[in-house]
């Protein structure tokens, strides 16, 4: 499993179809700025709106561009086991280095149900698995104790992406899960990434690194080298950007930002729509304020 910064890459569209030219340009921007992993088909990649055929294209292109320079982790979670396994097999076939598996949304399983779900998945793939906790989207919060039990019993469950903003839960993750050998804890929120990393976390699965990959990598490296003040300076230099990338539903603001920067068209798939005029103004001012444009 990687450590460092993994970019939750957007999926560019042009007139309703995949925009592979823009996607490749964005991937090269990431690799050239030393990103450690590309997270394809996560929340930021609009995964629920992507067909199986399109998934193949996106995964293969990410592998082609990344080569041996960055891991390609594929979001392959759904709200039911059969569809999740289908997505996993698709990821395996197309060369994924690992899997990001979100807790099953809508069904609202118990903690025991979550344990059985991840155990079943673990038994049906040899790829390394990141458990993805994002209760604001799924309606369910997987507890640190449940993750500990899963990782203890499932040899290929290797990491947690924690997108619960509760510092109490983040601290419990760090206290409990660090007892596991070779288990990684990733921040799923850019605005609390500095705190998690400074407390012993292993990396960030980042939205902001679509825009500022090198700066996110530098922040991680400073913390790893014990240069906390330098990392803190980066964190607060871009804190407004971290917050404003969520003033509308992700990935609406980050796609707006990337369109302003000239990387992609400002296009999403329904039910998501482009940023409002007021949001576009805020994003433009934010990018100018932190020196991105």
Curated annotation (Swiss-Prot):
Residues annotated as catalytic: 132, 161
EC number: 4.3.3.7
Catalysed conversion reaction: L-aspartate 4-semialdehyde + pyruvate = (2S,4S)-4-hydroxy-2,3,4,5-tetrahydrodipicolinate + H2O + H(+)
One BP term from GO: diaminopimelate biosynthetic process
Coiled-coil annotated residue ranges, if any: none
Swiss-Prot/TrEMBL keywords: Amino-acid biosynthesis, Cytoplasm, Diaminopimelate biosynthesis, Lyase, Lysine biosynthesis, Schiff base
SUPFAM superfamilies found in the cross-reference section: Aldolase
Residues engaged in binding pyruvate: 44, 205
Pathway assignment: Amino-acid biosynthesis; L-lysine biosynthesis via DAP pathway; (S)-tetrahydrodipicolinate from L-aspartate: step 3/4
MF terms (GO), sorted A to Z: 4-hydroxy-tetrahydrodipicolinate synthase activity
Translocase among keywords: no
InterPro entries with a match to the protein in the record: Aldolase_TIM, DapA, DapA-like, Schiff_base-form_aldolases_AS, Schiff_base-form_aldolases_CS
Family: Belongs to the DapA family.
Subunit structure: Homotetramer; dimer of dimers.
UniProt protein name: 4-hydroxy-tetrahydrodipicolinate synthase
